[in-house]
Amino acid sequence: MPRYFKRNWQETRGDEFDSWGTSVWFFEVDDHNFPTRQIEVYQNGKRLRYDSKNPFDDYGQLSDQALDLEEFKELEIRQDQFQLEWEKPEPRS
């Protein structure tokens, strides 16, 4: 049964895309706590989505590490909250 989490990152990327600002990450994880879908929403509006069909792009990739549920236990969200974010379009420039 998938579980869903939302995590605010208060640090910027520290790479050539640092100007995107801070971000909010959303995770759907499997029974072993590995991400199966992941969304990154940046302060500038940029949205990155990763899953098994799109595991990486020029900006990042689907995490290959299991989430530490001790660290994420207070960050669980409902499936519909995750799905709403997953379906949001990329803002137009």
Predicted regions and their residues:
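Intrinsic-disorder/low-complexity coil detector
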Residues: 1, 34, 54, 88-90
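Short, hydrophobic/aromatic-rich segments at coil-to-beta transitions
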Residues: 1-4, 24
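Positively charged, low-complexity intrinsically disordered regions
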Residues: 4-8, 38, 93
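Short helix/strand-capping turn motifs
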Residues: 9-17, 25-52
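Acidic, low-complexity, intrinsically disordered interaction modules
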Residues: 46-60, 66
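Short, compact, well-ordered microdomains
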Residues: 60-93
